């Protein structure tokens, strides 16, 4: 695509790199598999390895991660230090929280997992095959295969609530 930066990368046959995508493998390299779709406005950092038919959409960043065949992260997401299985759907706004302030940790997402929108996966963590993560969840523990995992507070509505008023300037 137009206005792309592509360096230190291997792009597979039939892969499409949409405009304004930034791919730079530096010393670790980047691999984009056959028939993969990347961008627009995606960023593939060193160690990003995309399998065949992977979709990395707009404003998705991938660093030091492997995505297996057919995995999708279509928009507004971060995958760092992750191993992602086949046919995973990674929801908009979801991130891997891979850095604890001192060390980097890995996230493993097994085959056929669906991660809802706006999830935080706090590494080290492993999501079992075929599982579903409810949107808005922050996960800190491994999840079993085939399970629906939801980790968020229940919605509460407070009737007749008044917003604080602005104080007059002194």
Task: List where the protein language model places each region.
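Glycine-rich hexapeptide-repeat left-handed beta-helix
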Residues: 16-170
